[in-house]
Amino acid sequence: MEQHPIKINKVQIRNLQIEDYAQLSQSFTRVYSDGSDVFWTHKQIQKLINIFPEGQIVTVVDDKIVGCALSIIVDYDKVKNDHTYAQVTGKETFNTHNPEGNILYGIEVFI
């Protein structure tokens, strides 16, 4: 199969802003194309931006969001090695985020 180069004019890595949500949700839909509605809500993204803006990153190619990395900081003493995703994210409420914690926990990454 012959591959054709794709022209890219601009690649940007920056902090996620709530104004990005429409594009971000479109990316979620493409990434999770199995028909499930397992993606972050506007309210959840807003909370992540409010509590830890520097931990929410997007990759933008030619003004289009093509990836993201979402994270929180947690205290390892409260999480330990045998945690579940629900436990470490506070069942996706992010009430486990602790700015004084000692672990950066990635809760979503895709490109």
Question: Which role does the model predict for each range below?
Answer:
Residues 1-79:
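Short amphipathic alpha-helix that is part of the acyltransferase structural core
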Residues 69-110:
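Conserved acyl-donor/pantetheine-binding loop and adjacent beta-alpha core of acyl/acetyltransferases
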